[in-house]
C-alpha cells in the first residue's frame, strides 16, 4: 500500500491602484499546490506494454507553484489613446516530471521532483488614434509579446534543460466610420528553442 500525506497551502495577495479614472495598476500573487496522482506514487511496475514500463515513486513531493502578475492600463477619453501592459512570472518548486530511461528496446518511465522551472510572459499594446477629425474612432494598434520558458526534464537520469524564447510583433489599422468598419493586421514572430542534451 502506497500512501502520502500532503498539506495544501493557497496564499494570495492583491494590490490595486487607480490614481485616475482612466489609469489602473494591478499587482497580484498566488501560490498553489499540485499533488502527484496514484499512478505516479505507486511503486508497482506497469508492464502492460512490455516495451514501455511505468513505475511510480512513493517519495514524490507535491509541487508548489508561485505566480506573480503585474498589469497596467491607461486610456485617454479625449484622444482615445490607450496603453495596456502585463507581465506574468511563474516558477514551480519540486515540479513532478517523467524520468525516462532507455535500455535497448525497453523504455522505463518513473517520476521525480526537480527544480528550475521558470516562465515569464509580457505584452504591451498601444492604440494610437488618427488626429484627423474625419477619422475619429479609427486607430493604429501596435502589440508586442515576449515569452521565456525554462523547463527541466530527465533523460537517462540526466537533466535536460530546455530554454524557449518567443517574440512577436503585430501592427494593425482599424477604420471605423459611419458606413465603413474595416481592419487589417500583420504579425511577425520569432521562436528559438535550445536543449542542454542534444
Language model segments and positions:
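Exposed, low-structure sequence patches enriched in small/polar residues
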Residues: 1-198
Amino acid at each position: 500500500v502506497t500512501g502520502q500525506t500532503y498539506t495544501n497551502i493557497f496564499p494570495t495577495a492583491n494590490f490595486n491602484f487607480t490614481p485616475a479614472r482612466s489609469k489602473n495598476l494591478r499587482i497580484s500573487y498566488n501560490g498553489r499546490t499540485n499533488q502527484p496522482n496514484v499512478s505516479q506514487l505507486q511503486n508497482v511496475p506497469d508492464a502492460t506494454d512490455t516495451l514501455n514500463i511505468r513505475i511510480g515513486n512513493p517519495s514524490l513531493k507535491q509541487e508548489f507553484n508561485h505566480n506573480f502578475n503585474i498589469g497596467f492600463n491607461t486610456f485617454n477619453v479625449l484622444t482615445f489613446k490607450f496603453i495596456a501592459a502585463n507581465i506574468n512570472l511563474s516558477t514551480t518548486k519540486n515540479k513532478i516530471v517523467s524520468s525516462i530511461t532507455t535500455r535497448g528496446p525497453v523504455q522505463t518511465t518513473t517520476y521525480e521532483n526537480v527544480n528550475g522551472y521558470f516562465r515569464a510572459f509580457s505584452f504591451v499594446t498601444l492604440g494610437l488614434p488618427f488626429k484627423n477629425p474625419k477619422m475619429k474612432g479609427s486607430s493604429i494598434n501596435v502589440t508586442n509579446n515576449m515569452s521565456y520558458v525554462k523547463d527541466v526534464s530527465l533523460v537517462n537520469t540526466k537533466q535536460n534543460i530546455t530554454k524557449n524564447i518567443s517574440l512577436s510583433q503585430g501592427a494593425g489599422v482599424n477604420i471605423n466610420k459611419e458606413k465603413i468598419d474595416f481592419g487589417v493586421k500583420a504579425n511577425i514572430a520569432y521562436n528559438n528553442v535550445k536543449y542542454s542534451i542534444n
